[in-house]
Regions:
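Signature of uroporphyrinogen-III synthase
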Residues: 1-255
Length: 255
């Protein structure tokens, strides 16, 4: 079949490496553009914080002087927040998120999101929160074990009382090399790698040479930097949602 303007990925094969249960929307977008999609989760998400830990953190935040903010940088953290009694546990707490996908995940569990920072970087969220006066109050950061410290540091420097709860960790999927090698051997045109932990898991499994010559589509400067550390060239999507990533894949393979 020949690619058309509406289906530019016809005849192309794209490897999607998102965690199990998180690839559906992206895979649908890619298929709508004509791609043959191979889903191989590179990482698994493991909860760390107990529900009572999250409730205690929310209760502690409510005891601070306003403004009180909860800042969420990943949809993985949203899954952990399902343990809260919503919206009661977040009464009086303003909520900020990095990127529309994370904001959408929060809204899906009944959380009103007041501030959405563009892109995927913590820097933009820090700017938004500081601009909204968060430095005069308290900020709770429910986040992953490997989350960068930039957001908390900047908020603290601005005067905020910052509390961090590690609520999940990412781990490589067992037997990942055994899954990836045959998929890559069958010809892959592009790979989506949407977090540094995914990059490291894939590289540890097959090595950087296995990805040379492929379009490596990522989201955000942190993930792009992870690829560059392995001397790989990233294609950085301008938007972090599924439609934006799929468009970046199509753009990369059109060149």
């Amino acid at each position: 079949m020949t690619a058309t303007p509406s289906r530019p990925l016809t005849g192309r094969r794209v490897l999607v490496t998102r965690a199990a249960g998180q690839a559906t929307t992206l895979s649908q977008e890619l298929r709508q553009l004509g791609a043959a999609v191979v889903e191989i989760p590179a990482i698994a998400i493991q909860p760390v914080a107990l529900p009572e830990d999250l409730r205690a953190a929310a209760r502690s935040l409510r005891g601070h002087r306003p403004p009180r903010w909860m800042a969420v940088t990943s949809s993985n953290a949203v899954e952990a927040l399902r343990a809260l009694s919503l919206p009661e546990d977040l009464a009086g707490i303003r909520v900020a998120a990095v990127g529309e996908p994370t904001a959408r995940a929060l809204r899906d569990i009944g959380v009103n999101v007041e501030l959405v920072a563009p892109g995927t970087g913590a820097g933009a969220l820090a700017d938004g929160l500081i601009g909204a006066g968060a430095g005069e109050g308290a900020v709770w950061l429910p986040q992953g074990e490997a989350a960068r410290i930039e957001l908390g540091e900047r908020l603290g420097q601005a005067g905020a009382d910052v509390a961090v709860t590690v609520c999940y960790r990412t781990v490589p999927v067992a037997g990942l090399r055994r899954l990836l090698i045959p998929a890559l051997a069958e010809r892959v045109d592009a790979v989506t790698l949407l977090s540094p932990s995914v990059v490291e898991a894939v590289i540890a499994a097959v090595g950087p040479d296995a990805l040379c010559g492929l379009s490596l589509v990522c989201v955000g400067s942190t993930t792009a930097a992870a690829l560059r550390r392995h001397r790989l060239t990233p294609v950085v999507a301008s938007r972090g949602d599924a439609e934006g990533v799929a468009a970046a894949v199509a753009g990369a393979l059109r060149r």
